[in-house]
Each structure stands twice: as structure tokens, then as C-alpha cells.
């Protein structure tokens, strides 16, 4: 299986779990809002619970504020042709997000960690639509969560990983300096070429990861989950056989 075939497979699988009732042929305002609402849930739900605050009354304000930004990028009305273009866009969206939440009484959620998660996950959801101009998302960042972080810990710079470990690998608490160092390091790792195992039982089955970090996310997000389940199952099976006095599985 090629990386493109695997990406197509994982995108379709992701769409079935997320948007069964959505029409993925039309990236209209309603669907863009849906992408943002799901991204906000990914970014803010846990922080809102811990901070005892509610952000959902602001959903319509947030979606209306960012709608045109995301539509213009996803449809390539706004061209993103260089890495610097995306970095400038990211910073504009980040500043707008932080300002909007802070000015509406949600200072506890006005954190960089939440902003980067909202931006990156929105682009991931947008990528799923047929009329999204995917080449315009080629410089997007890797969304950070438990599974993509597990992947990064296998391949990333040890010094940067140690800094991340100091905050318990909590993406919500990441600062801008560490975040940018991680994203730059991921670019460096991918540029060297990674043949990534895609079969838990047979690690020799591998696929070359692309340079597009959203596409990488679709692959490793699912595979790392499978790895986790597989390794836990092996551990339980070994424990069971050990108790029976059987040396080999």
C-alpha cells in the first residue's frame, strides 16, 4: 500500500466516524462551521470542564469570526504557497482566537495551547472535503494529541522531547517557543524520510510518510492507537501465560 492509498483510506475512515450525515462534496459555510465546532470541542472541552466555564454560548460568534478565514484558505482564494505564508496565517488566527476569548470573559481558555489545537484541527476537518484545495494546506502543522505525541516521541529530537516531558506532554499547556520547535523538528524528521510501520504484527510492512503534516496525522493517529491496543493485548496475554507457567506465546 502506498502512502497516498493509506491516506485516502484513513480519511474515509475518519469521515465515517465524524461526519456520517455530512455531504463532503460541498465546502459551504455550514460545513465549515461544522469543522470549527468539532475543532473547538477537541480544543476546549477538557479545559472548560477543569476551569468550570462554558464556551458554547460563544459558538456562533467564534464561527462567524473565523468562517471567511478558513473558507478562503480551504478553497485557495487566499494562496498559501510558502511555509512563511502559513506561519503568518497561523499567527493571525492565533492572535484573533486569544483576543476573542479573552474579551468575552474566557481568559482561562485564552491560552496558546487551546488556540493551536483549534486551528490545526479545523484544517484537519476541512481536508476531508472533496472541494478543499489540499495543496493549499501543504504547510499546515501536525495536530498534537496523545497519539501524534507518542509518534513524535519515537522520532523527534531528544532535547525537545525532554522539554515537552517537563510539562507532561500536555498540549494544552504548551508555550509558543516549544510548539514552534516541535513543528520545525517534525519538518526536519519528515524531510529525512520515514518508513513507518503500518502493521502491528509485522513491523516490516511500512509506508513512507509524506511531508504534509496533516496527511501524516491521518496515518499515525490511527496506527498509534492500533499499536497501543496491540501492545496492551500482548502484555495481558503474556501475563496470562506466565501465570499458567508457559514460557513462550
Residue ranges, per PLM feature:
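C-terminal accessory module of base-excision DNA glycosylases/AP lyases that mediates lesion recognition
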Residues: 1-37, 90, 98, 102, ...
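A glycine-rich, hydrophobic loop/mini-helix early in the fold
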Residues: 41-104
Amino acid at each position: 500500500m502506498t502512502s497516498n492509498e493509506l491516506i485516502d483510506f484513513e480519511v474515509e475512515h475518519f469521515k465515517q466516524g465524524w461526519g456520517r450525515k455530512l455531504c463532503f462534496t460541498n465546502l459551504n459555510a455550514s460545513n465549515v462551521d461544522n469543522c470549527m465546532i468539532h475543532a473547538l470541542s477537541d480544543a476546549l472541552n477538557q479545559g472548560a470542564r477543569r476551569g468550570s466555564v462554558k464556551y458554547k454560548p460563544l459558538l456562533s460568534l467564534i464561527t462567524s469570526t473565523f468562517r471567511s478565514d478558513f473558507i478562503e484558505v480551504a478553497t485557495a482564494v487566499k494562496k498559501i504557497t510558502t511555509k512563511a505564508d502559513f506561519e503568518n496565517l497561523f499567527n493571525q488566527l492565533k492572535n484573533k482566537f486569544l483576543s476573542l476569548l479573552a474579551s468575552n470573559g474566557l481568559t482561562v481558555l485564552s491560552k496558546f495551547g487551546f488556540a493551536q489545537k483549534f486551528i490545526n484541527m479545523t484544517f484537519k476537518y476541512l481536508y476531508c472535503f472533496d472541494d478543499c484545495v489540499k495543496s493549499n494546506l501543504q504547510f499546515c502543522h501536525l495536530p498534537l494529541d496523545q497519539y501524534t505525541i507518542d509518534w513524535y516521541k519515537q522520532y523527534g529530537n531528544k532535547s525537545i522531547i525532554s522539554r515537552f516531558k517537563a510539562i507532561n506532554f500536555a498540549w494544552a499547556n504548551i508555550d509558543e517557543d516549544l510548539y514552534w520547535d516541535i513543528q520545525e523538528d517534525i519538518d526536519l524528521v519528515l524531510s529525512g524520510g520515514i518508513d513507518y510501520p503500518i502493521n502491528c504484527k509485522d513491523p516490516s510492512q511500512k509506508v513512507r510518510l509524506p511531508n504534509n503534516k496533516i496527511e501524516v496525522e491521518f496515518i499515525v493517529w490511527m496506527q498509534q492507537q492500533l499499536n497501543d491496543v496491540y501492545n496492551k493485548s500482548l502484555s495481558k496475554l503474556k501475563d496470562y501465560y506466565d501465570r499458567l507457567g508457559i514460557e513462550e506465546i
